[in-house]
Design a protein with these regions (language model features):
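A cross-kingdom feature that marks ATP-driven nucleic-acid transaction machinery
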Residues: 111-112, 118-281
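A short, conserved structural fragment
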Residues: 101-112
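Non-catalytic, well-ordered alpha-helical scaffold segments
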Residues: 4-7, 17, 31, 63, ...
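The alpha-helix within a helix-turn-helix
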Residues: 10, 80-83
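Amphipathic alpha-helical "lid/sensor" segments that cap RecA-like P-loop NTPase cores
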Residues: 1-51
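Short amphipathic alpha-helical interaction segments
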Residues: 86-103
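Winged-helix-like regulatory helical subdomains adjacent to P-loop NTPase cores
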Residues: 29-80, 152
Length: 281
């Protein structure tokens, strides 16, 4: 497989060798995914349920949490999870969240700009894809082949690529030449009001050398081009973030995209570019 197809396989299957072993030579990524997950008798027809039964004694509670977290990319607080799932807010929920985190289904993080409270975020690509598309469309034997580049799957492609980036933090830091700089990783979401639109940043690398990498992650089948509308959105997020920083801190606008950036009149604010190849370092 090409590196582009390997990234796509991570977006759907999380790069798990067990799943990738079913890929058949001579077939495209889309065709292989259809054969494994869609149609009347796909190889992984009951994989979502089988996976949780095999790992957890309280599989149903775990699936409730995963279904909840799949609804919002930046995640939920423990209290929000309890409310959405009906699970008691107590030690049992804490133990289940810990077990899911230790098994790499979810991650726990502290959102930038919030002094208290932790969020839980779904990071398992297979679960995200299953809940988004497989459950509702499994009988459609050519679903991925017919829809992968269409608007039907556009939103998911962006979110899934972001998940892959979160799973390759060390490679991203290495590409930025900051592997030895102490840093924390966070997401940031700020609500707007009547005078100003809100902003959502899917990855911040907050460094001890007083630089913050504001990371924009874009999945693309070709070198990425920034138009005037996208530039405006990026500048808005940049300005909103700067308002929260100290006078000592600087922001480096960082683009992470599969095939790099086409430099043009709207790309001037981008200071660092990380490519798909960098994720293999």
């Amino acid at each position: 497989m090409s590196r582009y197809d390997i990234i796509q396989s991570h977006m759907v299957f999380g790069g798990i060798p067990y799943y990738l072993s079913y890929f058949r030579k001579g077939y495209s990524f889309e065709q292989n995914t259809d054969m494994m997950l869609f149609g009347s008798k796909p190889r992984l027809k009951e994989e979502f349920n089988r996976l949780f039964r095999a790992i957890f004694t309280n599989a149903e509670d775990c699936k409730k949490i995963i279904r909840c977290l799949a609804k919002r990319n930046y995640g939920f607080t423990r209290e929000e999870i309890a409310s959405a799932t009906g699970l008691p807010l107590g030690g049992g929920l804490s133990d289940t969240l810990t077990a899911l985190a230790e098994s790499d289904f979810i991650m726990r993080y502290s959102p930038y700009g919030k002094r208290t409270g932790e969020y839980y975020k779904l990071i398992d690509n297979f679960c995200l894809f299953w809940l988004k598309y497989v459950e509702q469309n499994q009988e459609d034997a050519t679903f991925v082949n017919d829809n992968f580049t269409s608007d039907v799957m556009k939103g998911w492609r962006g979110v899934a690529f972001e998940q892959v980036c979160w799973q390759h933090i060390q490679q991203i830091k290495h590409a930025l030449e900051i592997g030895g700089v102490k840093s924390s990783i966070s997401a940031w979401n700020i609500k707007g009001d009547e005078t100003k639109a809100g902003a959502q940043v899917d990855m911040l690398i907050i460094r001890d050398d007083n630089i913050v990498n504001l990371c924009e992650m874009k999945f693309s089948g070709s070198p990425y081009s920034i138009d005037s509308e996208e530039e405006g959105k990026m500048l808005h997020r940049l300005d909103m973030l700067k308002d929260t920083l100290s006078s000592k801190q600087r922001v480096h606008m960082t683009l992470i995209t599969t095939y790099g950036l086409i430099h043009g009149k709207h790309s001037g604010k981008v200071q660092k570019v990380v490519t798909g190849d960098d994720l293999f370092m």
